[in-house]
């Protein structure tokens, strides 16, 4: 980082402070993770300089022979990782991956059906504030009021009533296994396409610990970060029969030049996800989440759906009289990073919420296992049960710092920062 250190002190300091925050905080936001240094090196490479509109070997610019190699590798690795017939790795994000599928098969005003945002869905699955709910007629399915599991009977009834052209599977705050086969059965019964947004579960699917939607869905979209532990970006998988439509929808449909440095980083992440070590990582992510949920239940808290099959744990705080925002802020002071989150049938608005969402991907990347999850659950419980007690918050903060030092993050980067700090001290 010496070039940045010498060129832009303000940005350098912001990056160093963000590194220190990541190092000394328990990162429990379910959609966040820590990429490998190899992924970051690829993303920070000379490929950032190259424009490459079009597809590999069919570019609108010259000089693309080496970025073609990177994109070819990313495509083939994505296909192999998820057993897919076709992959487009150019979407800049999960949102743009979803948009590309919509644009490929829908017309404005067509009906789509996705999971209700307040029940665990995502903005791009038809929320009224999002393009998906503005351009298309969105209908929402949800979870059962008692079990908090997807209500497939309701989903079927709504599909029969509204005849959607596309049904969206997947979620951003649903901790359980989703029955992809059931979704396809319902989609077929009304002549709808099935698109699965596996963004949250992609790494678990790659690791073999969560069901793969590819055999069932017409289209599968995803991000490449979260459980997949790659750069912040997206991709699309589909059957060969839809390949041309998807490729044209991405470019020139919704994007111009792809980000070749990010595509190179995706290729690295896909290769990492093919390893036996990654399979063990995915298994540990789920094991950690299950222990976290179990400990919260022992501490007297209500866990939505009674547990988890994934990396997500959703706490319902209504019995505590606290809002998600209050708990998020209190935990933040104790160096524990979570996000406030709606729970099913939440009476509070999104800026407050009645719950918090936690996830285990980032802490598992740092090497933490079941014993650490038990400690983390107890520390979080201590803060919630003593909300507003600054002595308790400081005690927990010190415990967190000590734990984080036992599982260092990017030690090579830390050495470089310390070296540059010594140089700065001599100025």
Swiss-Prot record:
UniProt KW Lyase keyword: yes
Lineage summary: Bacteria, Pseudomonadati, Aquificota, Aquificia, Aquificales
Task: State the similarity comment.
Answer: Belongs to the SHMT family.
What this protein catalyses is: (6R)-5,10-methylene-5,6,7,8-tetrahydrofolate + glycine + H2O = (6S)-5,6,7,8-tetrahydrofolate + L-serine; L-threonine = acetaldehyde + glycine; L-allo-threonine = acetaldehyde + glycine
Outline the temperature dependence of activity: Highly thermostable. Retains almost complete THF-independent L-allo-threonine aldolase activity after being incubated at 75 degrees Celsius for 10 minutes, and retains about 77% residual activity after being treated at 87 degrees Celsius for the same time.
Q: What is its cofactor?
A: pyridoxal 5'-phosphate
Gene3D superfamilies referenced in this protein's UniProt entry, alphabetically: Aspartate Aminotransferase, domain 1, Type I PLP-dependent aspartate aminotransferase-like (Major domain)
Is the Cytoplasm keyword given for this protein?
yes
- Provide the positions where the record notes the PTM N6-(pyridoxal phosphate)lysine: 226
| SUPFAM superfamilies, A to Z | PLP-dependent transferases
InterPro entries attached to this UniProt entry: PyrdxlP-dep_Trfase, PyrdxlP-dep_Trfase_major, PyrdxlP-dep_Trfase_small, Ser_HO-MeTrfase, Ser_HO-MeTrfase-like, Ser_HO-MeTrfase_PLP_BS, SHMT-like_dom
Subunit structure of this chain's protein: Homodimer.
Q: Which gene encodes it?
A: glyA
Which is a GO BP term held by this UniProt record? tetrahydrofolate interconversion
User: What EC numbers are recorded for this enzyme?
Assistant: 2.1.2.1, 4.1.2.48
Localization per record: Cytoplasm
What organism does the UniProt record list as the source? Hydrogenobacter thermophilus (strain DSM 6534 / IAM 12695 / TK-6)
Protein's name in the database: Serine hydroxymethyltransferase
User: Could you say which residues bind (6S)-5,6,7,8-tetrahydrofolate here?
Assistant: 117, 121-123
- One Pfam family, short name please? SHMT
- Where is the site Plays an important role in substrate specificity? 225
Activity's sensitivity to pH is recorded as:
Optimum pH is 7.4 for the THF-independent L-allothreonine aldolase activity. More than 95% of full activity remains at pH 8.4, although the activities are reduced to about 90% at pH 6.9 and about 75% at pH 5.9.
Query: What is the top-level taxon of the source organism?
Result: Bacteria
What does this gene product do?
Answer: Its primary function is to catalyze the reversible interconversion of serine and glycine with tetrahydrofolate (THF) serving as the one-carbon carrier. This reaction serves as the major source of one-carbon groups required for the biosynthesis of purines, thymidylate, methionine, and other important biomolecules. Also exhibits THF-independent aldolase activity toward beta-hydroxyamino acids, producing glycine and aldehydes, via a retro-aldol mechanism. Thus, is able to catalyze the cleavage of L-threonine, L-allo-threonine, L-threo-beta-phenylserine and L-erythro-beta-phenylserine.
Hey, which pathway is this one from? One-carbon metabolism; tetrahydrofolate interconversion; Amino-acid biosynthesis; glycine biosynthesis; glycine from L-serine: step 1/1
Q: Name one GO cellular component term.
A: cytosol
Keywords annotated in UniProt: Amino-acid biosynthesis, Cytoplasm, Lyase, One-carbon metabolism, Pyridoxal phosphate, Transferase
Q: Which GO terms describe its molecular function?
A: glycine hydroxymethyltransferase activity; L-allo-threonine aldolase activity; pyridoxal phosphate binding
């Amino acid at each position: 980082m010496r070039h940045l250190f010498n060129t832009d002190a303000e940005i350098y300091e912001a990056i160093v402070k963000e590194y220190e925050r990541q190092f000394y905080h328990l990162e429990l936001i379910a959609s966040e993770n820590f990429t490998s240094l190899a992924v970051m090196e690829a993303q920070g490479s000379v490929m950032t300089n190259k424009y490459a509109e079009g597809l590999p070997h069919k570019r609108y610019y010259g000089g693309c022979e080496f970025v073609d190699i990177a994109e070819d590798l990313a495509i083939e690795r994505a296909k192999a990782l998820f057993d897919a017939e076709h992959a487009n790795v150019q979407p800049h994000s999960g949102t743009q991956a979803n948009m590309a599928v919509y644009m490929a098969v829908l017309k404005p005003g067509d009906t789509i059906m996705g999971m209700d945002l307040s029940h665990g869905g995502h903005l791009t699955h038809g929320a009224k504030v999002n393009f998906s709910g503005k351009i298309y007629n969105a209908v929402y399915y949800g979870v059962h009021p008692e079990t908090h599991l997807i209500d497939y009977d309701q989903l079927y009834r709504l599909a029969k009533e509204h005849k959607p052209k596309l049904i969206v599977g997947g979620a951003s705050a649903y901790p359980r296994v989703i029955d992809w086969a059931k979704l396809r059965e319902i989609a077929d019964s009304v002549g709808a396409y099935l698109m699965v947004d596996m963004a949250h579960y992609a790494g678990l699917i790659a690791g073999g610990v969560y069901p793969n939607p590819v055999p069932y869905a017409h289209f599968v979209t995803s991000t490449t970060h979260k459980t997949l532990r790659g750069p912040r970006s997206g991709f699309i998988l589909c059957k060969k029969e839809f390949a041309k439509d998807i490729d044209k929808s991405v470019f020139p449909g919704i994007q111009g030049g792809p980000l070749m440095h990010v595509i190179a980083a995706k290729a690295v992440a896909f290769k990492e996800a093919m390893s036996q070590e990654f399979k063990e990582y995915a298994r540990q992510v789920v094991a950690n989440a299950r222990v976290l949920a179990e400990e919260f239940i022992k501490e007297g808290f209500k866990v939505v759906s009674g547990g988890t099959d994934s990396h997500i744990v959703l706490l319902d705080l209504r019995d505590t009289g606290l809002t998600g925002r209050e708990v998020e802020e209190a935990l933040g002071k104790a160096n524990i990073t979570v996000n406030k989150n709606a729970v099913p049938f939440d009476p509070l608005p999104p800026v407050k919420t009645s719950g918090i969402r936690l996830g285990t991907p980032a802490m598992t990347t740092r090497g933490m296992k079941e014993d650490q999850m038990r400690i983390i659950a107890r520390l979080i419980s201590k803060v919630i049960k003593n909300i507003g007690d600054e002595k308790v918050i400081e005690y927990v903060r010190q415990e967190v710092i000590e734990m984080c030092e036992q599982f260092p993050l990017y030690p090579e980067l830390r050495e470089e920062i310390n070296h540059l700090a010594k140089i700065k001290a001599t100025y």
